[in-house]
């Protein structure tokens, strides 16, 4: 099977980029497959090694010489010409869009081979509307942009693949071409947590969406009862200075530590005893699965979408209503005070994480591709 992934870049350290590489590598290992990753911008080496994959850089370079709206549409026209030419040379069976800049173009291309066109949604459908808006103009712009995406461009795909049943049920009612496929675990760590260290951990970009300000306030409540425990927050981002100031003003220096960026996320997780998530929204919450894969129990806000899919409340962790900092702190304290419960939940999560192994997810994708290609062929032959 000839499979093409189209995305913005594989040189940027981001979740979509890592997941795309990991899936493409796994599919390329399956006998009979030939896999391409086609990018618009490749200014440096891929963030993960590519194993048996054709990498094609179209050289559009949206982000290196971007000159406003006029320049963007000029780049889009260039992108369309190059992408159409390449795909007609490859003649793929399946084309998957995972990025942003190609999503508008694929349904418009003239492709005589009629490949299966799939759009992967790595964010919950209305994620842009969930961000805090500063003006009515921004609200209107985001609404119009969303309508354009989902009522015109997205309908040009054969199938849309979302990450959770929750997203499908809440946001895609009436769409009969929407399917669900979770992301795989993208790294493996042989060392598992003992759940004995007096450390809780959170990982993510220091941005509004992750709401680490809420987590710091929660930890202020936790440390009143358990001053010997500490919280490590791993990641970098635009809110770092503001969060450091919040920590200082709350008297939590040494209790809450902004650790910076690490490429060894699972290793850091394995040295902790709890994983905490206070995001306002997630596309999937892959970080929760990664935490489970090293045996950590979870406490998470029940934000859209992902935590409800991953966490079975009371079994491998706890779900808390978004913004309920008091209950969140109580759940954390409950796990701190009950080591056997921590370990029991950690083991339950470890077992649950096995269904997200990349080998299993790759086989599920292959079966999905085969089924959808057969269905498309049947429809074509019946005309």
State each model region's role.
Residues 312-314, 318-325, 333-340, 354:
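Conserved acidic donor-binding segment of nucleotide-sugar-dependent glycosyltransferases
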Residues 17-22, 198, 205-221, 238-244:
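A conserved mid-protein helix/loop that constitutes part of the nucleotide-sugar donor-binding site
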Residues 5-13, 26-73:
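N-terminal strand-loop element at the rim of the active site
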Residues 297-301:
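Short hydrophobic beta-strand element within catalytic cores of glycosyltransferases
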